[in-house]
Amino acid sequence: MKKFVSLKKNSDFRNVYRFGVSAANRYLVLYKFPNKGLGRRFGFSISKKVGKAVCRNRLRRILKELCRFHLDRFSDDCDFVFIVRQTSSDQDFHQMEKHMWHVWGKLNKQEKN
């Protein structure tokens, strides 16, 4: 099984935002940017507007677990950044999974065009 790697540097996040492809729904925004052989990396951005620290950390843990669980579905050598919107604050694991795959489908559709 492949290792889960997180984006850490601000410059990595900025590159994904500036040059990546994005798709969104009411709950999530997903950015995807091909990197040069650095492997599959994930970043999570959750604003303080979403809720208190407990809520933000719960959403981050849910998304991190979803990415880890479905690691093989994500493209190799790409950076992915999930931005959680304010409406996500009351969502549970299965709802977030549904929203994640909805955004993933929109992103793949957009890349094909």
Swiss-Prot record:
GO terms for biological process: tRNA 5'-leader removal. It catalyses: Endonucleolytic cleavage of RNA, removing 5'-extranucleotides from tRNA precursor. It is an enzyme of class 3 (hydrolase). Keywords: Endonuclease, Hydrolase, Nuclease, RNA-binding, tRNA processing. Gene3D superfamilies: 3.30.230.10. It comes from the Bacteria. One of its GO terms (molecular function) is ribonuclease P activity. One of its GO terms (cellular component) is ribonuclease P complex. Its EC number is 3.1.26.5. The keyword Iron-sulfur does not apply. InterPro entries: Ribosomal_Su5_D2-typ_SF, Ribsml_uS5_D2-typ_fold_subgr, RNase_P, RNase_P_CS. The keyword RNA-binding applies. Belongs to the RnpA family. NCBIfam families: rnpA. Consists of a catalytic RNA component (M1 or rnpB) and a protein subunit. RNaseP catalyzes the removal of the 5'-leader sequence from pre-tRNA to produce the mature 5'-terminus. It can also cleave other RNA substrates such as 4.5S RNA. The protein component plays an auxiliary but essential role in vivo by binding to the 5'-leader sequence and broadening the substrate specificity of the ribozyme. PANTHER family: RIBONUCLEASE P PROTEIN COMPONENT. This is Ribonuclease P protein component. The lineage of its organism: Bacteria, Bacillati, Bacillota, Clostridia, Eubacteriales.
